[in-house]
């Protein structure tokens, strides 16, 4: 649970799969850079070994493989569907037993003082 991401994305200019691909590319490069250069990650060598190992078996990766290749892009056609998906996403850490209430998960828009800010629907 703590190693996956759920997003609700809307774009008026580009297909969401293109935006998501760019997001994954950019974040992978930045996170790998922080891991490689950082002194705070104690598991640095192990993590880089795992990313290198998985890159060996993927045809479109050079040195590291960070994100899974499969994306589950689900169109949300109605406001009701959007609200259902938000409720589902907020409840994931509760179902995983990481918190007792959705608002306790600090990496969620359900948190009282979220680090992630949602645009109005």
Residue ranges and their predicted role:
Residues 1-121:
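Short catalytic/metal-binding and nucleic-acid-binding patches
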């Amino acid at each position: 649970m703590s190693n996956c991401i759920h997003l609700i994305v809307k774009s008026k200019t580009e297909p969401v799969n293109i935006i998501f691909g760019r997001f994954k590319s950019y974040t992978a490069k930045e996170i790998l850079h922080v891991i490689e250069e950082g002194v705070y990650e104690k598991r640095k060598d192990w993590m880089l070994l795992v990313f290198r190992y998985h890159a060996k078996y993927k045809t479109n990766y050079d040195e590291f493989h960070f994100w899974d290749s499969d994306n589950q892009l689900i169109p949300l056609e109605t406001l009701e569907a959007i609200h259902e998906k938000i409720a589902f996403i907020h409840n994931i850490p509760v179902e995983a037993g990481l918190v007792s209430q959705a608002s306790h998960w600090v990496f969620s828009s359900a948190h009282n003082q979220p680090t992630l800010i949602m645009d109005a629907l």
